[in-house]
Amino acid sequence: MIEFGDFYRLIAKGPLSPWLDTLPAQLSAWQRESLHGKFKTWFNAVEHLPQLTPTTLDLHSGVRAEMSPPISAGQREGMENMLRALMPWRKGPFSLYGLDIDTEWRSDWKWQRVLPHISPLAGRTILDVGCGSGYHLWRMIGEGAHLAVGIDPMQLFLCQFEAIRKLLGGDQRAHVLPLGIEQLPELAAFDAVFSMGVLYHRRSPLDHLYQLKNQLVTDGELVLETLVVEGDSQQVLVPGDRYAQMRNVYFIPSAPALKAWLEKCGFVDVRIADMAVTTTEEQRRTDWMTSESLAEFLDPHDHSKTVEGYPAPLRAVLIARKP
């Protein structure tokens, strides 16, 4: 089973130490009571991966690991088989010892849109809410972060993260915990909090913004990336049964409305940093994620609309500060 002892020891003497009052019992209960029916299969794949330590590791321009001399073709094939047992791979890409994991999302493109607008991450302790496979955690480490903590209740993503970590030499600067934001105490201990691709899945978006705020230190920075619609500060889309085939989409505000929400929740220095239409080059079906993707979620005759007739996905990045 996945052990979290390294993380507990890591935070024991720092600002996250109060978390130890609740976290170990919480994760022990998760291991006993909440494991997915496929978890053992997924974790078995992780255990059968080789423990590799790269001679070249690039987390600045991507997530890339190489070894000299290179691993054998047989080792690479065995590694690929174990990683394919963890499909679908949604967030990436990863390049590992000559094997490229071509994920559904080009998460590196999102990072390129976000990075120019945020405060330097060097030396910072960071929380990434809804972190998926942990791709962006590694990019945060590549920018010099002291510690990057991701939370995501999806257990496949936890196994994907642990697989990548094992192939990166067991790097302890990034960690993923199988939790939702609502399961965290009000730590007020992170220098930066990222919430990317989460807000529209929340039934109560303002509660989510308060939860994010409660994790930040004073003067800490929130990086919020989410779906938006065009319009003024009063414009909010509340989809019906589905949006782009997703059932769990509740509120899609305009960027000005989202700015107003953040200000209502007490954030300051709120700015709309970026807006970008999601394309079928950024989100698409691949050999590592073979089910339907964005192309199937858009109107086949008019890609400016979803199949339900709503505006096609438009994503905004907002930056805000906790006073």
From Swiss-Prot:
Carboxy-S-adenosyl-L-methionine binds at residues 91, 105, 110, 130, 181-182, 196, 200, 315. It catalyses: carboxy-S-adenosyl-L-methionine + 5-hydroxyuridine(34) in tRNA = 5-carboxymethoxyuridine(34) in tRNA + S-adenosyl-L-homocysteine + H(+). It comes from the Bacteria. InterPro entries: CmoB, Mo5U34_MeTrfas-like, SAM-dependent_MTases_sf. Its EC number is 2.5.1.-. CDD domains: AdoMet_MTases. One of its GO terms (biological process) is tRNA wobble uridine modification. The keyword Ligase does not apply. SUPFAM superfamilies: S-adenosyl-L-methionine-dependent methyltransferases. Keywords: Transferase, tRNA processing. The keyword tRNA processing applies. Pfam families: Methyltransf_9 (PF08003). GO terms for molecular function: methyltransferase activity; transferase activity, transferring alkyl or aryl (other than methyl) groups. Homotetramer. PANTHER family: METHYLTRANSFERASE (PTHR43464), TRNA U34 CARBOXYMETHYLTRANSFERASE (PTHR43464:SF95). Catalyzes carboxymethyl transfer from carboxy-S-adenosyl-L-methionine (Cx-SAM) to 5-hydroxyuridine (ho5U) to form 5-carboxymethoxyuridine (cmo5U) at position 34 in tRNAs. Belongs to the class I-like SAM-binding methyltransferase superfamily. CmoB family. This is tRNA U34 carboxymethyltransferase.
